[in-house]
């Protein structure tokens, strides 16, 4: 170990959403970089406006700074920020792979939450040194002793090492920096061995192309060298290396133990895949960096421009966004109701919301998203296995041997008083109870298995309302399970509306169909003829409503007179309406789609 490695510390901060991770990062950087309070934005590492507005971290950012410790040495600290939301677990795993240790934040008033545990397990899998930090001790509801008990019993960590702080006021934050220097191990690596570096994130720069954020495990890297990407097999010439002191600062070379960035004339994000290993083209390392999980989309939805003329702008926007979001997948799709658009794969519902918000905000587009779906698996009667994420591709029921859907293991942490509400919600969502563990005398951890399709359908919102916001949720995939799935079509005046089709569990079809049809009845304006609205599985109608016709009083000009004259006029009107119904196409207003799809119904 050389002198540089001896005084280097690579660390991450992990926490549940809203437990003060970005605020602590601000305080650490304030001490280390001495950022000017007048020009400082809160949440320094949260570079996107959406991140600051929503108070969440989406992209993994990093900052390097020097710290003069009490032992008289100057330590070089690399802080790698991690997201805390369940959708961005892949960002957390790639950031942690670049570290030797983590600060685990626990909110002094709320204690251990679901994502605290999920992120802790990721850190333990990578064998990282964990320092517990109890934040928000300035709150009146803070209970430090209870938190220490939970840290010992629920997390299995040493409560004596827990540092009580207030990131907001800066109280005890200096102690955290001292603990990083004393308790976290320095990076190990041979600077003379062949280059081995992990790409843990990347972003697109208009002038430099793709910039890869890297952690070097072995070797050295400098400008002018030819590098080889081990997973994709491509080679590039390095044009710049450097470190990130909030902004990018070029340097002579990076060496084993360093966290920095590499620019090498890479034009697209596929050239710098997250989790790939960089080595020298002429002197390659024997094996790549292990322990990395690739991100897979779990939720799929159609994305269409409200104004059809904006399609080219959407193509351009989504391709640019893909440059900064390696987890996003998309393919072109055509809908009779909504025109040209894309079928987009997301990591989860929050990821979906953020992508749409970024497209609308950064590229000034008005968009509509169809109801989210998951990837179903079908075994045909000929024993072929196909995966379907779009209702329009659902095969004819005669050809289906069996259908399966993805299940997840959901961990819910909540106060004991809300257990009844949670159980009834999970039963409603076809969940199976696996386990209950007491984290403290009034806080429980409940584990369930339930279909992912039910989880993405208003589950999180309902969980929050059933528990007055006190429950927290985390989930992981557990594979596919047999399920009785059907495609439900919505017919307006006998014509199926493709944008409203969905794949549902047989037992839920009637309930879902009724909700959509009742909404449509309120939203579609009346026509000159009666409009039947139906929810159907194949030829079987499971729910039906009718929109009554507008009626013109054709007998108004008959003053008294013969009743047969009135009958004749009414018959004539009926004939006209019959003809109109055959020719007439029902205009479904855009608002009807927006209203139905926005609620996720």
Curated annotation (Swiss-Prot):
Biological-process GO terms, alphabetical: positive regulation of translation
Taxonomically, the superkingdom here is: Bacteria
Give the binding site residues for GTP: 18-23, 135-138
- Location(s) in or outside the cell: Cell inner membrane
Query: Do you know which SUPFAM superfamilies this protein is assigned to?
Result: EF-G C-terminal domain-like (SSF54980), P-loop containing nucleoside triphosphate hydrolases (SSF52540), Translation proteins (SSF50447)
What top-level class of enzyme does the UniProt entry assign? hydrolase
| Listed GO CC annotations | plasma membrane
Q: Which InterPro entries match?
A: EF-4 (IPR006297), EFG_III/V (IPR035647), EFG_V-like (IPR000640), EFTu-like_2 (IPR004161), G_TR_CS (IPR031157), LepA_C_sf (IPR038363), LepA_CTD (IPR013842), LepA_IV (IPR035654)
The reaction(s) catalysed by this protein are:
GTP + H2O = GDP + phosphate + H(+)
Q: What does this protein do?
A: Required for accurate and efficient protein synthesis under certain stress conditions. May act as a fidelity factor of the translation reaction, by catalyzing a one-codon backward translocation of tRNAs on improperly translocated ribosomes. Back-translocation proceeds from a post-translocation (POST) complex to a pre-translocation (PRE) complex, thus giving elongation factor G a second chance to translocate the tRNAs correctly. Binds to ribosomes in a GTP-dependent manner.
Its recorded name reads Elongation factor 4
Species of origin reads: Leptospira biflexa serovar Patoc (strain Patoc 1 / ATCC 23582 / Paris)
